[in-house]
Amino acid sequence: MKVLLIGSGGREHALAWKIAQSPRLTKLYAAPGNPGIAEEAAIVDLHTENHEDVVDFCRTHAIDFVVVGPEAPLVAGLGDVLRAADIPTFGPSAAAAQLEGSKGFTKDLCARYGIPTGAYRRFTDAEPAKAYIREEGAPIVIKADGLAAGKGVTVAMSLDEAFAAVDECFAGAFGAAGAEVVVEAYLDGEEASFFCLCDGKSVLPLASAQDHKRVGDGDTGPNTGGMGAYSPAPVMTAEMVERTMKEIIEPTVRGMAESGYPFTGVFFAGLMITEKGPELIEYNVRFGDPECQVLMMRLESDLLPLLYAAATGTLEGMKAEWRDEAALTVVMASRGYPGAYEKDTPIAALPDASAATKVFHAGTAMKGGGLVAAGGRVLNVTATGKTVGEAKDAAYAAVRDVSWENGFYRNDIGWRAVARETA
């Protein structure tokens, strides 16, 4: 099978690494890729925002299957264009991608289908939003409705912080994504991510993970796209997984189909495990980044036929086998991230990969014959172990072998799980 992978981040490097292991693969292409992905795939100079160029490439190179990694091309309708050209594609339609592309769309779906989530209101003007916030009080959550690269959410602990977040959205900080704001109740509990594949009708549960959104140790500082993750998340017990499937995932699949937007691809449910049980914070319509990296390290099964089954309506009866171990990834980022940061700083050395350790490339590039940091989140140093604590020790040992003066990272990825393991 000839496969084209769309994307250039750490998530796509993890997908490329796993797809490249498939005995069904004959050739893997990637666009735009990165130096890490180049170790697994042929990098293609393809402007993926020009959908017809992607179709032309697929026809010219007899591509059998396209895997779309990031959310933006999905929301822009790349999957629709490819499917219209009879090219099987992993990822939802633009209409179904509204689950991630519009927070308001998802909250309305939850309300219609009784899916547990925080109470909310939608606003297109600052003053009514602020009036509602005054009524509800803090803490409260302010979300830009559209895609904001993981940075459009403010958990406001005071009214002033909430008002500032509303003003930031409506002042254009997130462009069109902030033209509408969702204000929702603050949920108290422990966050977890849960992943499933869906072919429009059937659902295959994958695994859980826990992300670390805040930039600083102790979950301090501003939100980021994610500074680390581990899998599985201990809070996602067998009972919690069963409840998540019955109360959240299955009603969503039914609701999307009944609304005329059958969902194919990966469901990434951002959950808060509260005293009441699992509640939905948000949906994403692609693998998480950096959660994908820990999932791929743990996945025993061949990924390619699972993705193809989700894309072609043949998921029923499929199974995913998982290694009975934990995986943890530490994100190394450019100093200053998530604010302004210096680009093209040299990365002098990376640790050697082993069976238990892998460095996935995110914002990297080759310049002057050397590896440089070209983005905010740059490397995902990932390891496995019998426990989260063991995986954490292995990952941080590898982090110390990275020679990159301009990089920084959190020192406490996995702290909740390690505390549970050592209690």
UniProtKB/Swiss-Prot annotation:
Catalytic reaction annotation: 5-phospho-beta-D-ribosylamine + glycine + ATP = N(1)-(5-phospho-beta-D-ribosyl)glycinamide + ADP + phosphate + H(+)
This enzyme's EC code(s): 6.3.4.13
One GO BP: 'de novo' IMP biosynthetic process
Binding site for Mg(2+): 282, 284
Residues the entry annotates as binding ATP: 133-193
GO molecular function annotation: ATP binding; metal ion binding; phosphoribosylamine-glycine ligase activity
SUPFAM superfamilies found in the cross-reference section: Glutathione synthetase ATP-binding domain-like (SSF56059), PreATP-grasp domain (SSF52440), Rudiment single hybrid motif (SSF51246)
HAMAP family: GARS (MF_00138)
Name under which the protein is recorded: Phosphoribosylamine--glycine ligase
Species of the source: Rhizobium meliloti (strain 1021)
Gene: purD
